Amino acid sequence: AYKKEVNTKTKPELYSFLKDIHDYACVYYQYKTEYENQSDFVWSDYKNRLLLILDNLDTTTFNPYVLKVLKESPNSAEEKFFNLEKFLLQRFIFDGTTKNYNQCCEKLLAVPNDKAYLSEYMEESPTTNESYKVKFRKLNNSQARLILFLVEMLLRKGDESKFNDTLKIDKFSLEHIMPQKWQAAWMTVSSYDENGKLVPTSNIELFNRNREEAVKSIGNFALLSSKLNSSISNANFETKINGKVASNKGGIKKYSSS
């Protein structure tokens, strides 16, 4: 398609085409460089917030749309990026399929009303209100870290100067409160299913399955400024929270965001 398009152009048209490519490349370089050099993420920075979400959801499909908005519609970028951000997070949280995102982006590049189109896409490829319960019990580390990082950004919104540390996602470590190797120190801790019902230890298969699901759930994660020592990470709840003072090994309280 590219060769066919180029072959139909006159020399002046080719120069104009090359200039467009150059201009888009400059915009791309600028916004990617700003994002990669960002040392403190704040909620009001809508551009880098969207790039953070795209990056950590491993979604590059919408890069052409982001580039087009920045190049052609900078004055409406905040609204358009919010619409896309809302769409992406809804699809992610409610476990919507991403297999047609190529077609979605292609259409998004062409339609005059992005908000209306994204709403239409949601109706044609719906999610259910119950699916988030499943999604939040099977998060990988990158996904869980993103969710907690966005929550931290939102909690600091407008009060960033009150905090001693800066927010850069790569400097944070994700900690499982109940460790992945829970068998050693957590066997005597009661286990409850998603409905709050006690799971009996006599039903070993159900007990183990419930624990394995809970380990990967969003409520079992903490965002820390430093990785815990392995002797703390796999310890019981009290030790994980407070650490071991005698050996100067900190727990979750010491390394949680200040």
Placement of each model-derived feature along the sequence:
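Short, mixed-charge aromatic SLiMs
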Residues: 83-98, 172-173, 248-258
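Betabetaalpha-Me/HNH-type nuclease active-site subdomain
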Residues: 109-256
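A cross-family structural signal marking well-folded subdomains
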Residues: 1-154
